[in-house]
């Protein structure tokens, strides 16, 4: 089974492979999928609002937020402690929730109350503030991108130059910079 998987190259779909259903309200994608280590190396171009889960690569590379309808990211990967979520939403997409949507899941609620509908998680916000200060002091998002490319490439080079001892079956340009996934060619060793 491992040999079969090793021969199957995984990748993000190409732009021309994206099929948006007529009448679709939006296109959702996860910019960096952590289980298999697959990242979108491009931003999909579509004629509907683009919704992105950037939980695992938030603040790891420059992003033109004007190209998105909504971006959300759980802070626990790159921005702060678990329990804090960042949402960047285009104003024209607010106020469209179904009547059955709970108040706490309606982004319009947070916009109306400047993100303080309920007691803000002050400790989580404080930690995220410290992360932002550190990130800026280190050179900002472009520096984080440079570092993630450098670090991940060192690991991918070790995998690719292991004479088959390790393998990664992700197309090179779809390889995650945030989490490098690999296996051992010998399935018995994977079980240890």
What are these regions (language model features)?
Residues 10-13, 37-42, 60-66, 82-85, ...:
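A short secondary-structure junction signal
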Residues 51, 65-76:
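Conserved active-site segment immediately N-terminal to the catalytic lysine
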Residues 26, 70, 84-88, 179-181:
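Conserved hydrophobic/aromatic beta-strand scaffold that supports enzyme active sites
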């Amino acid at each position: 089974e491992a040999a079969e998987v090793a021969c199957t190259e995984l990748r993000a779909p190409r732009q021309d492979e994206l099929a948006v259903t007529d009448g679709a309200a939006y296109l959702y994608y996860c910019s960096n999928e952590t289980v298999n280590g697959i990242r979108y190396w491009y931003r999909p171009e579509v004629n509907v609002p683009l919704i992105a889960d950037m939980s695992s690569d938030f603040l790891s590379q420059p992003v033109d937020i004007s190209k998105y309808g909504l971006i959300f990211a759980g802070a626990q990967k790159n921005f702060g402690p678990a329990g804090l979520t960042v949402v960047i939403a285009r104003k024209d997409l607010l106020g469209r929730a179904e009547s059955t949507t709970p108040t706490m899941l309606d982004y319009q609620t947070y916009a109306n109350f400047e993100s303080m509908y309920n007691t803000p998680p002050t400790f989580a916000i404080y930690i995220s503030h410290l992360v932002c200060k550190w990130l800026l002091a280190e050179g900002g998002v472009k520096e984080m991108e440079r570092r993630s490319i450098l670090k991940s490439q060192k690991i991918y080079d070790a995998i690719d130059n292991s004479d088959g001892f390790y393998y990664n079956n992700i197309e090179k340009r779809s390889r995650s910079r945030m989490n490098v996934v690999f296996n051992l060619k010998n399935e018995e060793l994977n079980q240890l």
